[in-house]
Structures are given as C-alpha cells and as structure tokens.
Amino acid sequence: MKKVIIRKTEEIENWRRNINSEINFIPTMGNLHDGHIKLISTAKNDNSNVNLVSIFINPLQFDNKLDLENYPQTIDNDIKISFSNGADAIFIPSYEDIYPPNNKNIKFLKAPKELSSALCGLNRIGHFDGVCTVVYRLLNLIKPKNLYLGEKDWQQLLILKNLVLRKNLNVAIRSIPTQRDFDGIPLSSRNVHLSKNERKLISFFSSELLEAKKIFQQDKKINLNQIIKKLSAKKISVEYLEHLHPHTLQKARPEDNISLLAGAIRCGETRLIDHVFLMKRRPIIAIDGPAGSGKSTVTKLIAKKLNLLYLDTGAMYRALSWLIIKESVDYKIEKKLQNILKDISIFFKSNTNSHQDVYVNNYCVTKEIRSQKISSIVSKISSIKEVRKFLVAEQRKIGESGGLVAEGRDIGTTVFPHAELKIFLTASIDERAKRRKYDKNSKDSQEIDLYTLKELIKKRDFEDSNREISPLIKANDAIEIITDGYTIDEVVDKIIDLYNDRIPKETEIK
C-alpha cells in the first residue's frame, strides 16, 4: 500500500472508502517518542489492518495558553518516525478541519464528572472535555476498528473508554503499558523541556512510586504522607498523590487486589504525571457454568493465550470420585472418607502435547475421569461438606499468588470470590447435549442417544443447583455468556477482551 499524508477531512473520507480494510487508529499530538513508536508498532503487529496515525495539537485540552504555545512541534520528524514504524497513512488536519466554523454538527462534549473530577481534573478544568470532544470528532471521521492508547494517561484512558460506551461507538480500545526512559521516568512529549536537575527530581518521584509498589507487594501499607514529605524535602511541588480504585477513581479499599497510586508534580514550568498499579497477587479469572457449557475448552485456550495457569477444579472432584470408585470406598461413612482425603494427592502436569494431565497419587487419570460412570457420581460426592472443604482449601492454595484461570461451578461464589473477572458460561440443554455427544474425549457419551444425554444433563443441573453446599449459581458480579451459536474462538476472544478491559497491561510487567 502506498503511504499517504492526509490533511483535509474530505480526503480522509475518500481514503477510508478506497482502502478496503479495517483501520487501526493511533491519535497523537506530535513530538513522537518511543512511547508513540510502541503504539504504532503494536498496532502493526496486532493484525493486518491499515494503520493511521493522526498528528493534531488540540487547543481545547489545554487549560494553560503558555503550555499550548510551548508544546513541541516536530512535524517532519514525526512523519519519518510514523512511516518507519508501521504507519500506512498520517492525518495532519488544521484546527479549521477539526472544528470548522459555523458547523452546528460539531459536538462539544463533557467528560463524566465521576471520572474527571479527581486527579488531573481537579486543577485542569475543561481538559478532559477537550479530549473527549477531539477524540469523538476523530473517531467519527475515521471510523476505526481499533483505537490504540497508552496507559501513561490512565485517567484519560478511563474517560475515553467511558466515551466509547456512552456514545455506543463501534471501536475497540487497545492499550499498552507506560513506556519508561532509561532513568525510570515515563516517556512524555514534554520531557524535552526538562533541565538535567529537573529530570533527576522527576526520576526520584518515579522511583518513589515504584518503591511503593514493591512495599505493597510485601503486604505492607502505603504511607502517602511519608512519600509527600520525601518529595517536598527535594523541593518537588506535589499537586496530588492519591491511592485509588483503578476503574472508579474512588478511594482504594482494603479488599481491592489491584489499586492505583497516581501523582502529579511540577518541576519548573513543566507538569508531569506518573502512576503505578499496586497488586497483592496476579489476576484471577473465575469461570463457572453447568456441565457441557464449554468451560474446559474455553478455559484452556484462555490460559494459553494469557499465559495463566489453568486450574480445572471440576477435574479435581472427578479425580477424587475416580479414586473412591477404584478403592471401593463407602464415601457415606465419614471416617472412610476422611481417610481417603488424608492420603490423596491431586496435581496437574503439562504433557508433551502442551496439554494438562490430571494425576491422583502419581497416576495419570486424565481420560478415566471423563467417563459416564464418573459423571454419574461426581455431583453427589462434590456436594459432601468435607469434600468441598478439603478441595476448596487445595484450590485456594494453588491460587494464593494468582495468575490463573479456574473453571468449575462455585469458583466465583466460593473459591475465588474476589476474582478480578467472573464469567458464567452457559448454553441451552440441546446445545450442551450435542457437545457431549460429539466429544471425542468421552467415549461413553458417544454411545448414548441425544435424548438420554439431555435427561442426564437436566439431572446433573438439578443436583448442582440444589445442593446445600456451594450450589451452582451465577455470582452477582459475574458476566453471563450464552454460547449457543458462537464458535469457541469467538467466546475466547470475548472473555479475553473483557480481561484486557479490566486488567491494566502494566500489571503484566514484573
């Protein structure tokens, strides 16, 4: 594709009609640095869409006229950087193109107060209104499939996500982690204004935030006043330093696994922001649902794509059921059940095909536990109080450090009630029966007619939903996904999009 520079809104409309491709859009205000390069290269590597970079210094988002006048302009270098790193086209409009005079169709938007009244919004009145206005205008002109933004401006990212939802815009927001320079400070177009001494001061500010992150991981409290005192001792002017919930921007709660520590300082005439995410453990995805809803298949793929541990809790109950049958244990007699729980060892191990095998006392039972014989008894065994207490404790041990996706029937309600993302995966009984019928790993199901399979699934649903301990129910904060008519890949992509929307990319950086 021929690389082009577009300067007029009419040209952007003609170009969009002629490219015969979806668009990845990377909006910038110019003076591009390695952070922008990361955005452009990420867009290029994500898919085969056409990549469009815009360069437009938006006056509406400047609350300080001097700041606008001093904003660095390096247009020739920006063009070179954009094209050499994957841009197919560059849009460089004038103010009149974006905000044509006497055009009543231009909407000047207000940012939501619940997100814009804290942090930067306290002192930069109207800033986020200007951001919303220009991005909304650009999105309507360009109509991209994906919008690429950096997490450095986290508050702005939240506000633009809200804008997309509020205006029902058909665009997916893709974010990348804050990119830092050699001395730890976040890359910013304004860094060119810093003297050597000012840069040292900002580096100290960033290092204090990163140190707070380490302290938090050690399960220690963050002392904001102490950090502010340290900064003040260095003659650093602190505009704000807040510990907040990462999505609501309200005060962080003790039970929040992921929280935001954000600050703004001034060095000379330059104002800079920085933040870190504080995390007690890595994120957890909890996937619940009835038998045959596709939980195992979907969860395995999600674990692989997100590099998370796959915890098949249902397999643990099946493994115990297998041992009870094998040893002819009368599980209704408490003492005999306690003996088998005391001696059992259930663990998972990757095999040569990169799949996960289930072991009971060092014996691989991956295939055996999927038999109809096990299916007919596992619900009864899993409803026993002692069994659930034992296996839930084992599952929580595995999940102490997070970094996993677990599937079962009580993951989001009982095992991991504070999971960052809870999914309730389900499907119609007809659909689930068909899946069981044609499951290559279940020979027993292949030999049973569809009607009988439906009746067995109904029976299992009733038992799971009506057991006294940890019944199968949808967690209050779970997102229900009905999988009828969707491919496995579509369901997996949907859940990964939800995960990416909730979990900052920066939390993946150790």
UniProtKB/Swiss-Prot annotation:
Q: Name one GO biological process term.
A: pyrimidine nucleotide metabolic process
Spell out the residue ranges making up region: Pantoate--beta-alanine ligase. Answer: 1-276
Q: Where is this region: Cytidylate kinase?
A: 277-510
- Its Enzyme Commission number(s) read 6.3.2.1, 2.7.4.25
Catalytic activity reads: (R)-pantoate + beta-alanine + ATP = (R)-pantothenate + AMP + diphosphate + H(+); CMP + ATP = CDP + ADP; dCMP + ATP = dCDP + ADP
User: What GO cellular-component annotations does this UniProt entry give?
Assistant: cytosol
Positions in coiled-coil regions = none
Identify the metabolic or biological route this protein is part of: Cofactor biosynthesis; (R)-pantothenate biosynthesis; (R)-pantothenate from (R)-pantoate and beta-alanine: step 1/1
Q: What is this protein called?
A: Bifunctional pantoate ligase/cytidylate kinase
Originating species: Prochlorococcus marinus (strain MIT 9301)
Q: Which gene encodes it?
A: panC/cmk
